[in-house]
């Protein structure tokens, strides 16, 4: 198991797909798990739903070269995310986030990490995983 937090392409100079493809080529994993924030169409869903998909990760950009899928990476891709933003009703270039965003991120990260750990370590109990991860 390896973990990477790639950052944004503007900061790294690499697209997410380029970075993921390089890592998959070097590490040869059985699968890739991607975690990302999601955009919701409804405010009441912000921080209140979790989405898992085996179809891969499709970032908001329409450019298909940014997608992380079995076709683009050569291995199964599972995507997980929690909606943390939505388009503002006024102004096409504005997004809205909840006031409690830091708390939503912290609790959501713990939930997703626990889910991934449980899936990868089915012989361990939830209590054992909590003890191991602190």
Regions found by a protein language model. Give the residues of each.
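Short helix-loop-beta-strand segments that form the rim/entrance of peptidase-like active sites
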Residues: 1-7
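Non-transmembrane, aqueous-exposed alpha-helical and coiled segments at domain scale
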Residues: 3, 13, 21, 69-71
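Conserved beta-strand scaffold positions in the cores of enzyme catalytic domains, especially
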Residues: 3, 32-34, 77-79
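Short, ordered loop/turn segments at secondary-structure junctions
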Residues: 8, 37-38, 83-85
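Conserved active-site and cofactor/substrate-binding residues in soluble primary-metabolism enzymes
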Residues: 11, 15-19, 27, 100-111
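Glycine-rich phosphate-binding loop
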Residues: 18-67
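Ser/Thr/Gly-rich flexible loops in soluble cytosolic domains mediating phosphotransfer, phosphorylation
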Residues: 60-82
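C-terminal functional extensions of proteins
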Residues: 78-134
């Amino acid at each position: 198991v390896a973990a990477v937090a790639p950052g944004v392409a503007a900061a790294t100079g690499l697209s997410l797909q380029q970075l993921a493809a390089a890592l998959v080529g070097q590490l040869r994993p059985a699968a890739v798990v991607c975690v990302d924030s999601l955009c919701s169409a409804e405010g009441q869903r912000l921080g209140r739903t979790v989405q898992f998909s085996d179809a891969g990760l499709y970032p908001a950009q329409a450019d298909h070269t940014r997608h992380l899928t079995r076709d683009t990476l050569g291995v199964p891709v599972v995507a997980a995310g929690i909606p943390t933003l939505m388009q503002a009703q006024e102004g096409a270039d504005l997004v809205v986030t909840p006031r409690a965003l830091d708390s939503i991120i912290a609790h959501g990260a713990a939930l997703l990490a626990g889910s991934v750990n449980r899936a990868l370590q089915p012989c361990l109990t939830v209590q054992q995983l909590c003890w191991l991860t602190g």
